[in-house]
Amino acid sequence: MPDRPLPKNLQRSLKVSTVDEMWYKLLIEGNVRWRQGRHLFGMLPSNPRCVNCHRPFAGIGGTLLRVIQGTHKSDKNPRFCAACHSFTSQYPGGAEIELTMLFVDVRGSTTIAEKMNDSEFSRLMNRFYEATISVLVQADAFIDKLVGDEVTALFIPGFAGKEHARRAVEAG
């Protein structure tokens, strides 16, 4: 798909002219469009907040934004709001960037599964998923997928920071 121009209001606020330029800026610097609202959202009471735009998730500020804007946590990383995440779906595209991908799996899971009944193994895997996702989310990774005994996470510079590779190693 050829690169497309962004609407003029986004060109002015993001200081880029095309969708691919926006994606590059987003993936390297973070979701800059919503950062313009950080000051306003920061004045609303209540933590926890979206680490990107500072929208509150709880308390009176969170309730107010849920009612007015439908704000909720992202499915890919609950430290970010769905608005920051869904903004990108309005402008499909991408950019070639350096990022870190982490695969976490259960060593010997087949052998373990053979020694347990199905429900015990299912509970074990659910505990693995919960613990792993909790650590990865705290490191600002985006959970890409859960497959069998594996969790795949993306450490994107615009969200995990310039030290994304180090953060992935420390989280893993």
Residue ranges and their predicted role:
Residues 92-170:
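Catalytic NTP-binding/metal-coordinating core of nucleotidyl cyclase/transferase enzymes
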Residues 1-98, 111:
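Regulatory cytosolic signal-relay segments
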